[in-house]
Amino acid sequence: MTPGTNAPQRMIIRNARVFDGVNAKTQDNVDVLIEGSHVVGVSSAPVAGDASDGVIEIDARGRFLMPGLSDAHVHLMGNANSMMEFLQGPTGALYGNTIAEAKRMLLRGFTTVRDMGGDTAPVKSLIDRGVFEGPRIFPSQAMISQTSGHADFSFVYDVPEEFGGAPSRTEDIHFTRVADGVPRVLAAVREQLKMGASQIKLTLGGGAASMYDPLNTLQYTSDEVRAAVQAATDYGTYVATHVYTPAGIARALDAGVTSIEHGHLADEATIALIAEKGAWLSMQPFAEDDHHYPDPVRAAKNTEICNGTDEVYGWARQHGVKTAWGTDLLLEPQSAPRQSVMAARLGDFYSNAEALTMLTSGNAALFELAGERNTYRGAKLGVIAEGAWADLILVDGDPIADLSLIADPDTNFALIVKSGQIVKNEA
């Protein structure tokens, strides 16, 4: 609020070169007016108002103003904590580390993220209420897995719950949920929705981070996947699936899955099928050193996944697949800042303008499929336009000419605004 009034705080960013998140062509000499948490004006004519009116004025001096960045595949709790902390650390420390990482992620310019596994609904609530700073979060809550699936982090001789065993540690902290059979899958999906999930995350194949499942494994029967999709659809939202292989992707699409997470081992026919079905491909431009696996089995799986990246991006472009960008950094807190490096790496596969569009309005189009589970649906995300959320970054330099600028936000982001609040100001 403006001091002494009930009016929302007004801010004017003057003389900006605006990339609106949609159009590759920027607009010069633009004033952007913010009232409260929303953009209320984008004008090539000077906007009236100054400090005497209680207005915060920021002179962009012709610099590049863009929407806040987004990441379609984070594990915020996983970014912030190591595997040993997950398995043995105090639960309170897990959440403390997560809240601290949320602030660091916001300072990297990520104003919105879709969390694909972890108990982040309470973190989202605290951030949305202004208790802590961090990005907007679309939580999936626990990753749902079959026994011996990608999100089964129990120890090898632990007795599964199906045979009378206890939940694993990662289930106790709501990072994963192991569920076998249609009734338990339905219950698991509904459990995550009860806890505040915007969308549902199911694991349908092997992965690099998991110990018991080679990459070629098919996980969950078609009936189990359809059950998850039905339960999510009944709540007005969708299912996203961790899956790499053609067979796994085909099973997911046949069951009505909306978002294919990863897909790095797909063939061209499978990518064309994603386009035909109108589904999304949520990809990550992995390099081998993004993750560090100490054992040769998981290291080899990581290499195989990374080797598929170039072809899949090419086929996705060729077939017009709706593609989102994310990172999927997990269980290595020291690697969390690579989020910015991976965003810049998107320029290896798309033009810089296309990459920036995907990082802003493109990802937002996927997030919005959560329907009424999207608690931010009162305004547009990922754009600079009248009525949009006021999530903005002022960049020293031109990322359309040099996308590597976004890899170093500490140096190159002069101003970060989220929901009309200044997070960083070195303008």
What is each model feature region?
Residues D234, N307-P399:
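His/Asp/Glu-enriched, well-ordered alpha-helical/loop segment
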Residues A16, R373-A427:
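C-terminal cap of metal-dependent C-N hydrolases
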Residues T203-E311, Q318, K322-A324, L329-L331, ...:
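Active-site core of metal-dependent hydrolases
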Residues T2-M11, V18, V22-M66:
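Histidine-rich, glycine-flanked metal-binding segment
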Residues M77-L94, K103-L106, Q141, T147-H174, ...:
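Active-site gating loops and adjacent loop-to-helix segments of metal-dependent hydrolytic enzymes
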Residues D119, D128-R251:
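Histidine/acidic-residue-rich, glycine-tolerant segments that coordinate divalent metal ions
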Residues N97-V123, G134-M143, A197-S210, Y238, ...:
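Divalent metal-dependent hydrolysis catalytic cores, especially in the metallo-beta-lactamase
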Residues R63-R129, S148-S154, D223, A255:
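Metal-associated gating/positioning segment near the N- to mid-region
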